[in-house]
């Protein structure tokens, strides 16, 4: 079992499988049986370190450790959509703060994650006539703000929409462009996407390099 979490544009893996170490590079930081009380400091150091791109936390009591890890953070729930056109050969992307991303945002109080995902896509792209296809794996992202540690848990759904709908970027959310991407477009902009978005696309076989 491996838990994957993102921090800035880096990966944290939490596992009890030492065989993962066979595939590491010199840009990987490894912590064996880390003390849960030291985790926040470890994460801050890793986040600010330019040398390491991946952190592996190895615990032989994985489930217990992960629950304690999860409880270190204030959890923020979000939802978003991987929106396909009708022929399933294009994906809807947004350009926010100069980075290509997928439409997503916070879940409102009392709102289901499905409704939140549809609402966020509608608000951020102007595409509101959406058909849900299926629930995808969630992504986890750690960030720090005002001396607090947060874990954003985003619930993703694949969706379908007509390609000829008007695209309206939500300017107040700093969205500059909404655009349908072909696989070639994704490949051309791959280096200007967040690692979590790349992982979501690849793990669901929506894109292959």
Region spans (language model):
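Short hydrophobic/aromatic beta-strand or adjacent loop that forms the aromatic wall/cage
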Residues: 2, 78, 152-156
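Nudix hydrolase/Nudix homology domain
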Residues: 5, 10-31, 99, 170-209
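Conserved Nudix-box catalytic region and its N-terminal flanking loop in Nudix hydrolases
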Residues: 21-33, 84-122, 127
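Acidic, metal-coordinating catalytic segment for phosphate/diphosphate chemistry
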Residues: 36-80, 86
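Conserved beta-strand and immediately adjacent loop positions that scaffold enzyme active sites
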Residues: 80, 90, 177
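Unchanged
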Residues: 107-195
């Amino acid at each position: 079992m491996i838990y994957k979490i993102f921090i800035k544009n880096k990966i944290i893996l939490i596992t009890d499988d030492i065989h993962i170490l066979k595939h590491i590079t010199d840009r990987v930081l490894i912590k064996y049986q880390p003390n849960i009380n030291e985790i926040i400091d470890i994460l801050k150091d890793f986040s600010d370190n330019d040398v390491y791109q991946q952190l592996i936390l190895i615990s032989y009591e994985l489930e217990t450790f992960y629950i304690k890890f999860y409880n270190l953070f204030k959890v923020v729930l979000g939802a978003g959509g991987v929106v396909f056109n009708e022929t399933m050969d294009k994906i809807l992307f947004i350009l926010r703060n100069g980075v290509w991303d997928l439409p997503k945002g916070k879940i409102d109080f009392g709102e289901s994650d499905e409704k939140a995902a549809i609402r966020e896509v509608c608000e951020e792209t102007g595409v509101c006539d959406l058909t849900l296809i299926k629930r995808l794996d969630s992504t986890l992202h750690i960030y720090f703000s005002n001396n607090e540690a947060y874990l954003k848990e985003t619930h993703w759904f694949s969706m379908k929409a007509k390609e000829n709908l008007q695209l309206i970027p939500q300017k107040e959310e700093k969205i500059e462009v909404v655009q349908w991407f072909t696989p070639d477009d994704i490949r051309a902009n791959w280096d200007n996407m967040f690692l979590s978005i790349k992982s979501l696309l690849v793990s669901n076989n929506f894109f292959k390099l």
